[in-house]
Amino acid sequence: MKEVMSVNETVREALAIALLKLMKSQEFAKIAVSDIVRVAGVGRSSFYRNFDSKEDLICSYITELYRERFESREIPVRLYGSGNIEEFLTPRFNFIKEHEDIFKTLHRQNMLYNFFIMIENDIVPILCGHN
């Protein structure tokens, strides 16, 4: 069960949800920080206290979801020597499926690259046989 979020965590999540909502109807490049904070119902200073850019916001949000998913459970963070590749990859594909709406939005915005860069250090060594 997730612990109670701090006010700052709540603000960060509200900003991310607002950005994702806007991304469903607008091009990412045309979304202004003022649009995000308006939809999130927070002040502009809240955005800049937490993030350097819109890209930072979306990447931070997905990173946090990813960390929550994989640090809170007994899921292999890395696959070493005797590990099973299915045990490693299946939870990651399930993560994408569980957050399908986010990933579809990222895909429509041509931003999936950001997610794959984030998990690159996990998956590339496995795919190259260097576990």
Language model features with spans:
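N-terminal intrinsically disordered/low-complexity leader segments
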Residues: 1-8
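Short linear capping/connector segments at secondary-structure termini
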Residues: 74-78, 106-112
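Helix-turn-helix
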Residues: 22-56
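Amphipathic alpha-helical packing segments from all-alpha helical-bundle domains
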Residues: 110-131
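Short, hydrophobic secondary-structure boundary micro-motifs
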Residues: 31-32, 104-106, 115
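Alpha-helical structural segments
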Residues: 13-21, 39, 56-76, 87, ...
